[in-house]
Swiss-Prot record:
Domain notes: Shares weak sequence similarity with ubiquitin family, but contains an 'ubiquitin superfold' and the C-terminal Gly is required for isopeptide linkage.
Subunit note: Forms a conjugate with ATG5. Part of the minor complex composed of 4 sets of ATG12-ATG5 and ATG16L1 (400 kDa); this complex interacts with ATG3 leading to disruption of ATG7 interaction and promotion of ATG8-like proteins lipidation. Forms an 800-kDa complex composed of ATG12-ATG5 and ATG16L2. Interacts with DHX58/RIG-1, IFIH1/MDA5 and MAVS/IPS-1 in monomeric form as well as in ATG12-ATG5 conjugate. The interaction with MAVS is further enhanced upon vesicular stomatitis virus (VSV) infection.
BP-aspect Gene Ontology terms: autophagosome assembly; autophagosome maturation; autophagy; autophagy of mitochondrion; glycophagy; innate immune response; macroautophagy; negative regulation of defense response to virus
Family classification: Belongs to the ATG12 family.
The protein's name: Ubiquitin-like protein ATG12
Amino acid sequence: MAEDPEAVLQLPAAPAAAAGESLLELSPETAIPEPPSSVAVSPGTEEPPGDTKKKIDILLKAVGDTPIMKTKKWAVERTRTVQALIDFIRKFLRLLASEQLFIYVNQSFAPSPDQEVGTLYECFGSDGKLVLHYCKSQAWG
């Protein structure tokens, strides 16, 4: 199956905003152009000098009997919280209100719902992306 390179998904913004007022834009990897290889990069970092990357790449992997998302790599704003990701995944997978969803970083721990994705990326990101596992039942610590 071919995926639509222009696919963009939207979900409600930060929890403080009223429902429907603003939308979070998540786009698959194919909708984000890669920077040219001629861009100067500081030693030890993956970001151009003097410019902070506004979105980070997140790789979402299903665990257990949880449905698999066809698009696994997403670009998300650094300021988004883990709870916003949980809400997005629940909506994307069309989970019932009674079904739980757990998020794990690197198959080891569940981050706090108010934790910002950018902070997780800085601490646990590797190869230019943050790997998050999602499941409907508790899997790790």
